[in-house]
Swiss-Prot record:
Keywords tagged on the record: Host cytoplasm, Host nucleus, Isomerase, Rotamase, Secreted, Signal, Virulence
GO molecular function: peptidyl-prolyl cis-trans isomerase activity
Protein name (record): Buparvaquone-resistant peptidyl-prolyl cis-trans isomerase NIMA-interacting 1
Source organism phylogeny: Eukaryota, Sar, Alveolata, Apicomplexa, Aconoidasida
Residue ranges of every copy of the PpiC domain listed in the record: 34-142
Keyword Glycoprotein belongs to the record: no
Self-association state and partner proteins as the record states: Interacts with host FBXW7; leading to FBXW7 autoubiquitination and subsequent degradation.
Organism: Theileria annulata
Pfam families documented for this protein: Rotamase
Primary subcellular site in the record, as a coarse category: secreted
PANTHER family according to UniProt: PEPTIDYL-PROLYL CIS-TRANS ISOMERASE, PEPTIDYL-PROLYL CIS-TRANS ISOMERASE-RELATED
Mechanisms controlling activity: Directly inhibited by juglone anti-parasite drug. Not inhibited by buparvaquone anti-parasite drug.
Biological function: Peptidyl-prolyl cis/trans isomerase (PPIase) that acts as a key virulence factor by promoting host leukocyte transformation. Binds to and isomerizes specific phosphorylated Ser/Thr-Pro (pSer/Thr-Pro) motifs in a subset of proteins, resulting in conformational changes in the proteins. Promotes host leukocyte transformation by binding to phosphorylated host FBXW7, disrupting dimerization and promoting FBXW7 autoubiquitination and subsequent degradation. Degradation of host FBXW7, leads to stabilization of JUN, which promotes cell transformation.
């Protein structure tokens, strides 16, 4: 009975097209969290969590983020530590959710962010990624 149903689905050209495209669409998304540090040259140099203007230079943001990256790479529980750090330090409103940005496709985020996100394996952290928004660390959740 199940085999007949699957054959029906597969033999129906419209349904086959829908099934294949649904699978491809689902596979072409990632779920990531990030930690964002803004700097005076950022597109909007305001901390989204405090409403305060950001006064650090780009070099200071990079230096601070390198410290976080080193700490995360030494962590025994990357997922938990990343979310804790993103909640405490990220200047994006996603900090309230441990930096979780949810699922997104290749056309949602800024190009450098997208490229880095899609290169990551699940449970992997990026190197520093610079965008117009600031300096990011990206953690791929799914």
């Amino acid at each position: 009975m199940i085999r007949n149903f699957l054959n029906f689905l597969w033999n129906n050209t419209s349904l086959r097209f829908l099934i294949i495209n649904t699978i491809i669409f689902a596979m072409d998304k990632v779920r990531c969290a990030h930690l964002l540090l803004k700097h005076t040259g950022s597109r909007n140099p305001v901390n989204r969590n405090t409403g305060m203007p950001v006064t650090r230079t780009k070099e200071e943001a990079v230096s601070e983020m390198k410290g976080y990256l080193e700490m995360l790479r030494k962590s025994d529980n990357l997922d938990q530590e990343f979310r804790r750090l993103a909640t405490a330090k990220s200047e994006c409103s996603s900090a309230r959710k441990g930096g979780d940005l949810g699922f997104f496709d290749r056309n949602t985020m800024q190009k450098p962010f997208t490229e880095a996100s899609f290169k990551l394996e699940v449970n992997e952290i990026s190197d520093l990624v610079e965008t117009d928004s600031g300096v990011h660390l990206i953690y791929r959740i799914a």
